[in-house]
Amino acid sequence: MSRAALDKDPRDVASMFDGVARKYDLTNTVLSLGQDRYWRRATRSALRIGPGQKVLDLAAGTAVSTVELTKSGAWCVAADFSVGMLAAGAARKVPKVAGDATRLPFGDDVFDAVTISFGLRNVANQQAALREMARVTRPGGRLLVCEFSTPTNALFATAYKEYLMRALPRVARAVSSNPEAYEYLAESIRAWPDQAVLAHQISRAGWSGVRWRNLTGGIVALHAGYKPGKQTPQ
């Protein structure tokens, strides 16, 4: 399977990511012009985690994002449904679990925080995934969604769309182990809702205080919220 369709059949998506795993981190850095490192640091900072806390890094892929989160001193586990991606990150010494975002292999109220970076867009049933994230998070615990979004400047947005549909596939052919997967990436980004719509979807799944912050002119947005309950967010 070289690429998934926009209906996002879980088996097709997992197979697609297995196919890009070998050069995934390099390809991301090249295609983002190095911005992926900044986005990971911003995610860690926005999540506001620290020593003694438990964090689930969902759709963690090769666990490069999980390693960044551990710099906070928190205990972090990487979860992904692509076994190939987890295997590609075997050298990264963090706990790793294979699992589906809509059926997480964890009990209720386990984590102080949950994050998903560039993964929610690849889940067929996003509401189910957001509810599962809430289930495994303690009351007062935090959610951070880092995802591609809609640039706020109209001229920049036009240039960005041209990059997605024209330049990105060409660059992917030069560096990726599965360049056709990046055609899916471009199409899925263009089909993804804007910041306000995603915030509404997160709230509808049971998260409170949902807000967002744009990065790189809105190419990426961080959506944050907390699980309502007796404890208050720290």
UniProtKB/Swiss-Prot annotation:
Residues noted as binding S-adenosyl-L-methionine in the record, renumbered to the chain: T62, D80, D100, A101, S117
Domain of life: Bacteria
Enzyme class, UniProt record, top EC level: transferase
Residues that span the membrane, as ranges: none
EC annotation from Swiss-Prot or TrEMBL: 2.1.1.163
Keywords: Menaquinone biosynthesis, Methyltransferase, S-adenosyl-L-methionine, Transferase
InterPro entries: SAM-dependent_MTases_sf, UbiE/COQ5_MeTrFase, UbiE/COQ5_MeTrFase_CS
GO biological process, one term: methylation
MF-aspect GO terms: demethylmenaquinone methyltransferase activity; methyltransferase activity
Reactions accelerated catalytically: a 2-demethylmenaquinol + S-adenosyl-L-methionine = a menaquinol + S-adenosyl-L-homocysteine + H(+)
One Gene Ontology CC term in the entry: plasma membrane
Function in brief: Methyltransferase required for the conversion of demethylmenaquinol (DMKH2) to menaquinol (MKH2).
Additional facts recorded: Was identified as a high-confidence drug target.
Assigned protein family: Belongs to the class I-like SAM-binding methyltransferase superfamily. MenG/UbiE family.
Protein name as annotated: Demethylmenaquinone methyltransferase
